[in-house]
Each structure stands twice: as C-alpha cells, then as structure tokens.
Amino acid sequence: MKAILYFILIPALLPVFIILRYVYLLDKKEREPLGFVLKVVLWGAIFSIPCAGVERFMLSFLSGFYDPASIEFAWMENTIGVALVEELSKWLVFMLLVWKNKNFDYRYDGIVYAVSASLGFAALENILYVISYGTGVSIGRAIFAIPGHATFGVFMGYWLSRAKTFWLDDKKIRMRICKLFALGVPMLIHGFYDFLLSDQVAALDLRSVFFIYVILLDFFAWRVIKHEFRTDRML
C-alpha cells in the first residue's frame, strides 16, 4: 500500500515541489515563512475541490447558449466555464489568507504566494489525474500543466502586488483595477491555453500554435519573475 502511494504521489508532486522551491528561494530580501507558504499551498488544494462541480454547472449553463461542437462554445467553455472558476479559486485563497497578512510586505511576495496557491491547486489536480490515468500522464503534465498553473500564478501575483501598493497609498480605484487584472489576466491566458487544447481547435491542427504559445508564456513569466526579484522592495 505504501509503495503504491509513493508511486502515485512522487510523479504527481515532484514537479510542484521543484517549481515552488525555485520561486521560493529567489526571494532573497526577506524570505517568506515556510509554514505560511505551505498553508497557502494547502488551501490552494482545498479550494480546488468544489471547482469540478462548479465547472460542470457552468458547462451545462453555457451549452444552453452555444452549440457544444462550435468554436464559440470551446472559447466560452475554457475561459468562463473553466479558467474563470479555477483562477477565481486561487484569487480567493490569496485574498482570504495573504492580502492583509503582515508577511505580504514586499513586492516579490505577491508572486511567491500566488504561485503557491496555484501549485496547491495543481498538486491535487495532478494527483487525481495520476490516479485516474496512471503515471504515464505525469510527464506531459510536468512539462505543460503544472508550469502552466505556476505561470498563471506569476501574473496574478504581479498584479496583486501592484494592488497592495495602491491600497497602502489609499488609491482605491487603481487598487480595484489591479485586483481585476490579477483575476482577468490569468483567466484569459489560462482560457486560451485550454482553448488551444480543445477538441474543436484540435480539428484545425493548430498544435504548433499551442507550443509557440507555451514558450512565449514561459518566457514572459520568467521575465516578470526576474524583474520582480531584482527590483524587489517594500510595499
């Protein structure tokens, strides 16, 4: 039983650990309390649990307005029915646990905590995939799905750090705009990512577009991380 558990957990969680460790250790100025980071990871996983039910409801709702075989349905399904639900769950974890926490006091912290929430979500999702489809899926998910969730978290954290700066400066309108961007930007890039993998788009043979998109996403996420940890300062 123990061997089976390890056989499932190691391939499912190893890429999560590697990415989280990398992002965490880049925080040179004031490293975040590891216990609190892991708490955010845990709640990211917990908040992912109701997402499947909400997504099923959203897809049923959207099918009343769009032909399920259409490109329009694929776009709405993946942006509103999936990406919005999943990114909102991560955004809520951040707002409930991190936003007013005293440890969220440097700009790079936003990325650390948003990526932590995203990887918590990805961790449980990955465990369920490995249980359902076997360890064979873990390689593809380690290359694409888990780094994808981390990338969405990078952009969320970037905008939430900007929102916190405006909140502290009592610039409430700018704060709200940045909070909206913190949800909207990850939702759109996540939605387009899933859209390119949908059956409707697969019929158009646009796999090369997907790979180019992933490379560009990873490149820009790395540039954001690099900029944020090099210019890190107190909020």
Specify the residue positions occupied by each region the protein language model found:
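Hydrophobic alpha-helical segments at protein termini of multi-pass membrane proteins
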Residues: 1-235
